[in-house]
């Protein structure tokens, strides 16, 4: 693997949109993403396997979190300055890309922001981020608000949890194969269903709490995978889950993906945004 002289250092080109011409900004985004794809830098512990290419901009709340050249995690836009992602994705700062579809091309819909403020759940075990998955939820506050367009829109939160059997959708730029890494250029989607909590507990004995939920289409082996962490599980038009963890290799029969159950954190999310 070719090694860069150093991680991609964001210089004056990383100022907020408007500080540079649109063309220069677009080139910067392309360079950032291209470096990540070429070097294979994909972050996040979790596991879209056997999905399909999303219709362009059909998931306008989808966010890509980068750290320098590294595709760190997915995230979900929930307010003009706020993202929701997994706590195990936490870093000191992020480059945030919104309005993306094909990471090798620009279509004028892209927006970029920076963020240095993260608010992981206070009960998340940061000393064991890849082993203890309880309370794997975090808010990220961007340095400036985004502009809502057809390609950039927030996703609704709901205090009501969904029932087993509900059809949902997951999305991300994570690897499309496992255990080998194969990174897609375009955003991938997969249709999954919520699984009974007892079945989830049987799949991962002793590791499932009431703030987690499982989803998959086990007959077809669909699942989220590396690089998808922090991304959305969308059910009935609302954010019901955050991609958190699962079996490695991904999409193994009888081993569903595990998600943070967002409805259980509805009050906490709004409290953090209100106080910050």
From Swiss-Prot:
Its EC number is 3.4.21.-. Gene3D superfamilies: Trypsin-like serine proteases. One of its GO terms (molecular function) is serine-type endopeptidase activity. SMART domains: Tryp_SPc. It comes from the Eukaryota. It is found in: Secreted. GO terms for biological process: proteolysis. One of its GO terms (cellular component) is extracellular region. Residues 1-44 form the signal peptide. CDD domains: Tryp_SPc. The active site is at residues 88, 136, 229. Its main location: secreted. PANTHER family: KALLIKREIN-11, KALLIKREIN-RELATED. Possible multifunctional protease. Efficiently cleaves 'bz-Phe-Arg-4-methylcoumaryl-7-amide', a kallikrein substrate, and weakly cleaves other substrates for kallikrein and trypsin. This is Kallikrein-11. The lineage of its organism: Eukaryota, Metazoa, Chordata, Craniata, Vertebrata. The gene is Klk11.
């Amino acid at each position: 693997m070719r090694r860069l002289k150093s991680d991609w250092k964001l210089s004056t080109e990383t100022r907020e949109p408007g500080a540079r011409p649109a063309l220069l900004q677009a080139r910067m985004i392309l360079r950032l993403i291209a470096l990540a794809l070429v070097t294979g830098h994909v972050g996040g512990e979790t596991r879209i396997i056997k999905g399909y290419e999303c219709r362009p901009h059909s998931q306008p709340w989808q966010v890509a979190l980068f750290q320098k050249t590294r595709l760190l995690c997915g995230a979900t836009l929930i307010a003009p300055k706020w993202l929701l992602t997994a706590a195990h994705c936490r870093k000191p700062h992020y480059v945030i890309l919104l309005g993306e579809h094909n990471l090798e091309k620009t279509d004028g819909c892209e927006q970029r922001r920076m963020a240095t403020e993260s608010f992981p759940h206070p009960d998340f075990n940061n000393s064991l981020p890849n082993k203890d998955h309880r309370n794997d939820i975090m808010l990220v506050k961007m340095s400036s608000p985004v502009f809502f367009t057809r390609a950039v829109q927030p996703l609704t939160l709901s205090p009501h949890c969904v029932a087993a059997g509900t059809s949902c959708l997951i999305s991300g730029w994570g690897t499309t194969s496992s255990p080998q890494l194969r990174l897609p250029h375009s955003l991938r989607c997969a249709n999954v269903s919520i699984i009974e909590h007892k079945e989830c507990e049987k799949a991962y004995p002793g590791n499932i709490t009431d703030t987690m939920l499982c989803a998959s289409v086990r007959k077809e082996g669909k699942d989220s995978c590396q690089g998808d962490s922090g991304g959305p599980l969308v059910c009935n038009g609302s954010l019901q889950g955050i991609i958190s963890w699962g079996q490695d290799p991904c999409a193994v029969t009888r081993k569903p993906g595990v998600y943070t159950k967002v409805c259980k954190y509805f009050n906490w999310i709004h409290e953090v945004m209100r106080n910050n």
